[in-house]
Amino acid sequence: YREGMQYVHDQPIRLMNKGLTPDQIVEELDLPKNLKESPYLAEFYGTVRYSVRSIFNGYLGWFSGDLADLDPLNINEKSQRISDLAGGNENLFSELIRASDASEHQWVL
């Protein structure tokens, strides 16, 4: 158990020091096979992905390294532009229904 916790703490820091963003670290980091197979490290109440983001925020704060985070569009402006780009609200709603029917829950969100 201790080895797993140490790995999940140290590896994000190693990748942060290489300049990776939280999203990049989440995609790159995975437990080694010997830790993944441990019943004591099963992901019930949290995941390595959650932990990576928490560790990043704990050490470096809210800024992810993405310049778009410094002064983002407000949510209404961003939503309208995305809707326009997609061809309007009807197209977005159709995609929402399709994704929901396909159990693509993360995409629906």
Regions found by a protein language model. Name each.
Residues 1-109:
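Accessory terminal helices/loops
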